[in-house]
Regions:
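Transmembrane alpha-helical segments and their membrane-interface loop/helix boundaries
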Residues: 1-108
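Small-residue packing motifs within transmembrane alpha-helices
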Residues: 3-11, 110, 118, 125-127, ...
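Short hydrophobic alpha-helical membrane-anchoring segments
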Residues: 15-24, 128-132, 175, 179
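Membrane-interfacial segments
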Residues: 25-33, 133-137, 177, 181
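Hydrophobic alpha-helical transmembrane segments
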Residues: 52-67, 102-115, 138-150, 173-180
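Long, hydrophobic alpha-helical segments
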Residues: 61-78, 109-135, 139
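Secretory targeting signals
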Residues: 92-123, 158-181
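Helix-loop-helix units of permease transmembrane domains in multi-pass membrane transporters
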Residues: 127-165
Length: 181
């Protein structure tokens, strides 16, 4: 069916582009955090010899490390912040939330491999599965298959196997990204 090929092609393109963009974003964020952490380490060590308590009051920024799998699903990283200011006798909140800098749509919808696998692929499978059965019924093929002795369960299992293969093909870019990371 042409719809299966279309959904497979679009799904693979979307999943591959999401994986590539997420990997590039992860690399950029790691580089920026490493540079900021290095600068902060230099500032901390450059404060000279002090009483340790006074040095603790001087404060230091610490940066949350990014795990490798954050390329596939960053989680709440964009909403909770990336760094925190540590100082003695005071508890500070996380700072520098990337979602606060983005546009409204960017706060809610970020194209990640996780979004493709958790939302878009299942929706495509539901629509394709419905379309498969509806098209067979409208063309009169379902009764013809039943007259040839094919049980309805076997027909449904065959359609389910096609959809499962399609879902696995759509998950392939994310699985390759996990293997490469």
């Amino acid at each position: 069916d042409w719809r299966v090929a279309l959904v497979l092609a679009l799904g693979l393109a979307l999943a591959a582009s999401a994986a590539l963009l997420a990997a590039l974003d992860l690399d950029r964020a790691r580089t920026a955090r490493a540079a900021a952490a290095s600068a902060e380490q230099g500032r901390w060590t450059g404060q000279g010899s002090k009483n340790p308590h006074s040095a603790a009051h001087y404060g230091v920024y610490v940066f949350k490390p990014l795990p490798t799998l954050a390329a596939l699903d960053p989680g709440v990283e964009h909403y909770v912040g990336t760094s925190v200011w540590l100082e003695a006798h005071k508890q500070n909140d996380m700072a520098y939330r990337p979602a606060a800098d983005g546009a409204g749509a960017d706060r809610q919808f970020r194209l990640t491999p996780a979004l493709v696998l958790q939302v878009l692929a299942p929706a495509a499978m539901i629509f394709l599965g419905f379309g498969m059965f509806a098209a067979e019924r409208e063309r009169g093929m379902l009764p013809a298959l039943r007259l040839n002795g094919a049980p309805l369960g076997a027909i449904a299992a065959a359609r389910g196997a096609v959809l499962l293969c399609l879902a696995l093909a759509m998950a392939l870019p994310a699985l390759l990204a996990i293997a490469l990371l």
